[in-house]
Every structure is written in structure tokens, then in C-alpha cells.
């Protein structure tokens, strides 16, 4: 077993019983793959698939003019390179995007020739706007901020059958309906009403009889009846009527006459119910014709028009009911045969026949006109318009698109073998749907479950972007069509037709303000990954949270292995926003698939098959915890499994698939909760949601008890830095790592050096700190994909969201009542939960009417203390400690001293004189913020002079870039000279520097005495070697040129003006790092949904302590466990204690300098006792010592979800650590030194500090802004508002009879404007008198009443 660089340093002991045969898939694959397929940027134009941008262009082009004499064809598209990289876009507030250019061809046809010939062809590349590019981590940078496009779960196109569950009609009768949903186009609904008529609706408009639609499609009534009914045939011979008998059709009917054979045998007597036995008897007798009385025909419905053969006269139309009168006419015409519809009340209803009767249309045209009137009320129906509308509804590819998915789902549902076909509807499609609907009403078939994941599909970012791009192109198409008619006369080129604005605005709107384009949750690496794996049922074309019912939100059996049943928000969005399960992926149709191991001949193989929800239901699938031996043969006779979405038991030879892993059913966040199987689902939901809110601590600490997936999340999120190629660490400092790449991995022509610039103290979207730290040293040998630097919340390449705290479960003086948390002062003093938050503040210098605002240090009335922090440009220096109210950027705005006369205004305008008086509009530190200035960025518009500070920032940036280039050049040169030395040593020279003799052999000593760049002047006898030397020299010269060009490009980028909003001359951004220590009121939580607020920070000496004198860090209330049913936290605490103590044992061995073999033996006892076996023999002695040093703070354990440590294994570890197997110990009161009455559960728990910090919530105001109308103080911290004294608070004061306090609250402390001023004056004078007047809101009320026409006057008393 091979370990990666970081894994070797600290191996996590896993209790997993079953090794997963499938590695964890790349967690961001859904996003990245979807957008790659959309762009197809790396694929040659000729080989691109018809998807994404290619499909959007193909769907709109070619565009033809109205007269068909000019055509615009699309050939291919090309994506350019982005101007700025991701980091530069974030700093400058730009969108990380690439220019899109489409090559189009304009063809002008000569219509006047006998046959259309090509007159002129013009080809050109046309700019189509900018397309945002995805970053390596699956996000987008839009206007400088990172955003995520959330995938949408919507109802798949296709046909769906359902009923109203008896809710529509008071009788509870089930009303069936069918709906054909296209990807794009009109919805078509079919439905039954309570009277059993069948109606259709288009786009949920007024309903019409379904036969109207059938007639509009060209079907006659007789054809409609023939399609939907089976017929009964009657033969009329010599005034006798014979019935062609099909015995099966008579079952359940009441015999109206004796059923007799020709020889007189009575099979069924009159008025008897025909049973299955009667039917069998009739079939055995092979009776095909029976005589029936005339009355039997009464009430039957004619299947076809009844025509008098002699005269050709139509006696009765198809669908007419046979009455006595009609029967008489039939006798007279001497018809030999009559066909009627076979209907009954039980399972062959006359629904279409009834509907045909209420249909008022007579022929195809009248039916189409009726549909036109329903769709376009008020418009006159001309024949052309009627036909155009009807054909455009479902038959036109431009207007209607069922999509490949829709066609597949449609064909599968109506029972066709072929799963592909036209993406528009055909007449057969509509007929088939109505047939199935009628069959459902007749009691045959099943309705669809719309919450089944086989009926819901995922639209990922690529598909969503494609739809927006297509919508933009469709707008372009209209404009192009108009202009194409002028193509020939005005000699226009292709770029004259295409205006890219509609396309770029559609894309910009989608990425900037769509409901599915969300501001990325960047609190910690897990929240990033989870956000990108989120699946939302909301958004355009989806559900709304008001209309979504319980069923849509509920967990469905098909969610198994596809969508996490645990992770979803609490509140109004519950169940509508879900998370993709750990191993799930989407297939080509957008349906979620999950992997299974195939079972062949009763043996579990290692072959992995992905199944969608539709495919899965037909198989018998065992769970991952099924027991099987080494050969894959099940050991149990009966195995728990799933079949047809039900949990059941099956014999082992019936099993067809097995789950891939126990963690398959949950999402990333839920799979990070150890002992998840022991937690109640509600608490697990809170636990997975709260992990996303954990603030990165100053020093990340790996969880002692994890699940083994921590490394995957840290690496896949992009937070931890991985090597692109293997190599040796050449240089490392806090901000950069230089790696000399292995020769085997460096491709020809590539630079054999990789430089990783680390992110230092950068602000995330949530103001948390992103900081990367190297974990390698110079000389370390690395492989590809090794972790070389930790990011926020990662420790040695593992996710570390919180800190391991020593926990005691016990009450303590009521301070941990109701989930409150008691914390030791040591936790604060050791900076265990201290976090850094970075605030971004911006000052903007604008052009005003009176002149330009100036950023300067020369500010009126500024104290020396404040001015000392500013440099000569008026900008705060980096490293300054600032507090609320301090000046960060000095800025003055010109102000008009007096109101100018028009003449003065004119003179000012002519002579360009600026205002002489200025006011201070400097950027101050807002209330509640104090910290250290860590960075300043200055952006200047093109043409505006840069100040000294701005020039210095550019010089520093160029210096850093130059250092990178110098390192690259140093390694490239060293590599080149090394190759040259190997090439030259021992070769015969033809001459060279330092008087190298002809035909002498070149030695290493000679080369050392010659300057290296003169080696290339050596002339060699062997031409081949000379050529190789020349190639090395050329390659070196080429690299130098490339580096010079790169430096020039960087210099050009930094020196050019910045894009700023209109009217802005200069913008200064100041970044302040705020250190937040733990304090009372901060919210903390474990990973099991056990959350609480810190009630008190207790001195270390007062905390309960153990027998060895170790005080506990945190005291939790034991009553928080039983009612919440999250026992996982107790097991975590036990195992955490064992982990810590084992670490101490390892540390003691290191301290006493024990032999490496002893340490190996002890580590073997830990790692290879139970669970997953670790190969410690593959480690060298120094690697074992490095591992032991890293384990001294605690041996990390992994207890995978649903496959974790058992109670016996926890006890075993406690025993190995020399701890009581109960996990409890006697604690002593820190204040009295007395032992507590009974042993207390003590151990280590991974505790998180959540992003609900009391500093962000606490807020105080004395005076501040007031509302304009009511003159009452504003509300909320952001507005620096006051606390609302509401109705109930008024009642409280009234109840106490505190009339003066109440008057003060409602007047001078609120909206009595004059009273406020007077109170201020009286306080200044030292006289605390209150003179309450009229509240402003009362005046507002008076005005309101006056507006209603009631005059109110106030009288003075």
C-alpha cells in the first residue's frame, strides 16, 4: 500500500470493515464536466458534438431572409484567451471571461436566374460577446465576486399520467389526467371531468373536448371510434339478429335473455349474472354466433355511418345510439350487418364516444378554428393563420422541442421499443397518450409518481447556460432576418448583421442575477464543495416554495444513493434544496445515477455499474453491509435488499447487485459526521448544515475522530495545494513553493519548474480568512497530486473545521442550562478558537459638478494621531492598528460655499475654476471594527496620474513577478547547463575559449574554469554533438525571450488604467484583519447537531479537573443528549479520549528515546488490531519517527458512516490507552477540590465555532439616522438603528404604571423632533428635564386621515 506525502506524515486509523472498491469520485465533477461540455473549447471545431454552444448555434443558424435571397450560415466558433487571470479579476472587480468569436458565412443568391444560383459568398469572424469561464474549482468570477451556478432538479420532459386523488369532486371520484411536457413549447393536457368526458387544454387555457383536437388532426368520427373502441358485430338474416359472440366480453354482465346454442342448449338463463364459469363453458362449446332479441340492440352505439345501399342515403351517423325508430329504419333498409361499439360500465367505458357527442365541431377546419379562437381570442381566424397556428403548436421544430430526453421518456412510457425519434409530436403520439389515459380510467395501468427520480432530471450549469445563450441568439435572429433583405443592395459584411448585445446581455443576466446563480458560500472548504454539489428544485422553470407540497419535499425511495436524505435546509426550503450523494453522478440524459457492484452467478464481482432510478427498480439490490466471504459469495441464506423501491428480504441467489459502499446514500457533509448511524435524522440534518458554518480557526486542528473522507474534501475543494507534476522542492517560504520537476514528467519544450504562489490572508465571500501554509521542506521528494500546502481549515491535507476539546458531560451551577456551554479560560488564552476575519472597505474619488474629489493627506481638522497613520498620498499604511472612527483614506470633496448666481456658474464653467472650499469625506473605520490593515489596493482610471503609493504597489507586484521568473530561469539554466555538461564531458573539441587545443578531450575541470555561458562557444569535432549543443543554446535563448515577454505583459497589465464605474477617477480598497477571540455569546456546535451558546468563560482554576490534575476545557449539559437522541457525540467523546491518550503514550516513547522497533510494535497494536490494516513495514525508520511525532498530539481515527467502530472496538482502544473502559472518570470541583458524587463521561470532541459571532450581532446606539417620514430611528445593525419598542413592550410599562418612562419612550426617545433637541440641550446644561411634545408619527396619522377627506384640527390647551 503506497501512502502520499501527507498521508505518511499522519496515518488515520480506520475502523472500516469493508474496503471500497471504487475511489471517491471527484466531488466537483458535475459542475466542471457540464461546463466543459458546454464550451468544448479544447475540441477542434470539426469534431465538436452537437451540444452546448455548438447546439445553440446550430439551432438558430442558418438564418434566411424573408425573400430567401440571402442566407447566413454558421461555420464554427472560437474562444479567445481571458485578458486577466482569476486573481486579477477578483481584485479589479471584473468578470473572468473569454471573448467568443463565431465564423459565419453570408451567401447571396441570384433569384432572377432560371434556377437559384450563388451570386456572392462572404465569410468573416464575428465577435459574439464574452462567455464567463469556470475556475479550476468549479466557480465563476462575476464582477469580482465568486459565484456558483446551482444545478436544478426539474420535471423531465415527456408524458405523465396522474389523478387528483379524489380531491376535486365531492364524491371522491378519481379524475385521471395526462400531461405532455416538452423541453420547449406548449404543454398539452388531457383530463377527465366528473361526467367522464375527456377534455384537452393547451398551455393550461380553456378546456375543449378531446375529439376537437382529433378532428383538427384530420380524423373523422368513424376513424376516432375505430381507434379507441373494439366493435361488436351483428348479422341480420330473415328478420333474425345474430350476435358474433366473444365470451370474454360478457363476463360480469346481466343476461337480458337466455343464451342458447343453435341446438337449443341453454348456457345462461335470463336475468342471471354471467360468471367466469359461464365464459369457460361458452368457450369450450366453441359458440361464435348466438341469436339475440331486437331489444338487445337498443342503446348500442353505431361504430360507423349506416348507409342505405340502394339510395346511398346516410340513415344514421357513426356514434348514434340505436333507438326503436332507428331499429325500424334498419329493418326497412335490409342491412345485412351492423357494427356497434363494445362498451360496458365496468372496464370498457364509452368516454370518447360521449365526448364526441358534446363536440360541436363538424370537420377538420371547424375544429382548427375552434382551437385558434381558444388560443387567440378576439383575432379573426383566416385560413392561413389558423393552419400556421395549429401546425406551429406541436409539429414545428422551431416552436416545439420534446428534446432527446423527452422523446426517450415518452417512448418508454407509451411502451415503444425504439427510444429515439423526432423531437416534435406526431398524431400517433397524441393518440397513444389518449389511449393510455382511457385505459387508466378503465382500471388498467398505473399512474406515474412525479417525485420518482426517474421523472425528475438535473439541469447543470452547462445546460442552463446553453438555454440562455440560445434565448439570446433567438433575439439576434429576428434582427438579422430584417437586415438580410438589405444585404445585397448595401454591400454589407456578416458583422454588419449580427449585434452581439442580446447574447452577451442574456449571458450576463444569467450569471449575474439568475435565481440559480448564487453568491458562493465560502465560509470553509466544506461549504464551497457542498454549494457546488447542491441541487435545487426552485428557480426559473422549477417549483416555488409557496406552491411546493409535502410530497415533493419528502424523501423518496429513489433518493437512495442519488440525493442525500439528510442534508437539506431547515425552514421554508426544506426538501426543495438537496445535496448530491457521495458517489452519485448525472448521465447523458440528466438523470442521477449511482454505482453498484455486479453479482454474477451468486458471486459479488468488482465490476461497477451505474444505474439510474428507472433501471434500478427492476433489479434486486443488496445493501453494502451484506456479508460475503473473500470469494464474494454471500454467507447468509437470506439477504436484506431493495426491489421495486421497497425494502425486502431475498434469497442470496436472487441478488443481482450490491451497494458500492455504506456511505453511498449520504452527501459529503453528512458523511463527515462520525457515528452518524447513532444520531437521530433531525440532529444529523442540523449537524451537516452547521459544519458548513464553521469558521476557520487560527490554527487548524485535525479531528481526532473523523470518517476518513476529510482528506478527500480538503483536496477536491482546491483549498489544499496539490502538485501538478512530481519533483523536488527547490525553494520554500511562507508565500511560495518552487519545485524542480522530475525529468520523466517534464515534456519537451516545457519549463521544468513549477512555482506555486500561495494565497496569503485573502478575504473570502463571507469575510473569513483564506491563508495557505507550506507543509514541505527544501529537498522533499514529491509525487504528482501530493499536498504541499494547507489552506483554511485544513491540517496536513485533511479537513479540520474545529478544535479537539476535552469535554465533560455534567451540570455546572446552572451555567450550562438549556444547551448553554461553559468554557475554560485556557481555551481563550491559547487562541484555540481565535479566527481572523477580513473586512474590505473602499473609498471612491468621483468627478462632481464642482470638481474632482481628491484623495489626500491634507484634510481639514484632522488630529495628529489620525494623520500619523496616513502616508503622503493620504492612504493608511499597511500594518497600522486601527479602531472604529479612524481615518483610512483621506478624501476631500469640493463644496459650494454659497448658492452661486447663474453668472458665477457661467464664469466657473468657462474658466474651469474649482470651488475653493472643501469638506472632509474621508473613509473611516465603521463602528464595531478594529484590527490591522493588511493590504491596500489602488485602482486608477486611464489618463489619471498615479500617486506615489500606487506606483510603489505596482513596483512591489513587479518585483514579486520578477522573483518568480528569476527562479524559473535559474532552474531552467541549471538544467540546461547540466545537460550541456553531460554532453560535452569526454567529447573531442575542435577549439574553444581559454585556448582549448584542437582534438583535445573536454574534461570537467576545464568546464569548471570556463564561464557557463561560454560553453556554447566550444567547437566540437562531432557534428551531431554540435547540433545537440546548439539546440540546448537555442532552447535557453527561447526561454529567456519568453520570460522577457511575460514580464513585459505583466508590466503592461499593471501600468494600464483600470476599468472603473462611470464618473469614478480613483478607487482605494483597504483590507483590515480583525482578530475575533472566543467570548460569551458566540455560538458553538459539535458535528451531531449539538449546538449552544457560550454562557461563561470560567477561570482555569475553577474548572472541574481529573485525578491527574488536567482541567476540562468544556462542560456540556448531559440533559442535551437523551431527548435529542444524538448518541453519536457520546461515542465520539469516548473514542476521542482513547485517541488523545494513545498520542500521549507515543509521545512518552519519543521522549524516552525508545527504539524505532518498539514504536513500530506499539503503532502496529493501534493500527492493525481491527478494521482496515495499515502497511507500516513500507515506511522507513525516519518516516516512522516523523509519523510518531505527528501522532503525539493524538492518534486520528476514522469511523466511516454506517461502517464505523463498534462498542467493543472503542473499549479495546480505551484499554490500549490505559483508560477505564466505561469512558468515565472521577472529576474534582476546581473551586473546592472535592470529588463530584459519581463518575463523569469525559473525552475529546471536535467542536466548531460557528459564523454566528456575538461581535457581529451586538450593537448599541445613542443617536443615529432617523426615518424621513415618521422621524423614528431606523432599525437594524446595518442602518445603525435602534431597538423597536413595540406594542407588547408598551403593555409591560402600562402594567407597571410607569407613565413617565412610557412617555419618554414614545416621544423624546423616538419621534418628537423638538423634544429630542431640548433633551440634548438640558443634558448639556446638566439639567435632566424632559419636555415631551408631539410625536411626528401622530402628524403622519393626521395627514393620513385628512387624505381620506376627514378634517382634523389640533387645538392648543
Swiss-Prot record:
Family matches, as InterPro entries: DNA-dir_RNA_pol_bsu_ext_1_sf, DNA-dir_RNA_pol_bsu_external_1, DNA-dir_RNA_pol_su2, DNA-dir_RNAP_su2_dom, DNA-dir_RNAP_su2_hyb_sf, RNA_pol_bsu_bac, RNA_pol_bsu_CS, RNA_pol_bsu_protrusion
Reaction(s) the record says it catalyses: RNA(n) + a ribonucleoside 5'-triphosphate = RNA(n+1) + diphosphate
Description of how the protein assembles with itself and partners: The RNAP catalytic core consists of 2 alpha, 1 beta, 1 beta' and 1 omega subunit. When a sigma factor is associated with the core the holoenzyme is formed, which can initiate transcription.
Record-given protein name: DNA-directed RNA polymerase subunit beta
Any one GO molecular function term: DNA-directed RNA polymerase activity
Gene: rpoB
Coiled-coil intervals, chain numbering: none
EC primary class: transferase
Pfam families: RNA_pol_Rpb2_1, RNA_pol_Rpb2_2, RNA_pol_Rpb2_3, RNA_pol_Rpb2_45, RNA_pol_Rpb2_6, RNA_pol_Rpb2_7
PANTHER family found in the cross-reference section: DNA-DIRECTED RNA POLYMERASE I SUBUNIT 2
Family, similarity comment: Belongs to the RNA polymerase beta chain family.
Domain of life, source organism: Bacteria
Keywords: DNA-directed RNA polymerase, Nucleotidyltransferase, Transcription, Transferase
This protein's GO CC annotations: DNA-directed RNA polymerase complex
Organism: Nitrosomonas europaea (strain ATCC 19718 / CIP 103999 / KCTC 2705 / NBRC 14298)
Protein role: DNA-dependent RNA polymerase catalyzes the transcription of DNA into RNA using the four ribonucleoside triphosphates as substrates.
Record NCBIfam families: PRK00405.1, rpoB
GO annotation, biological process: DNA-templated transcription
High-level lineage: Bacteria, Pseudomonadati, Pseudomonadota, Betaproteobacteria, Nitrosomonadales
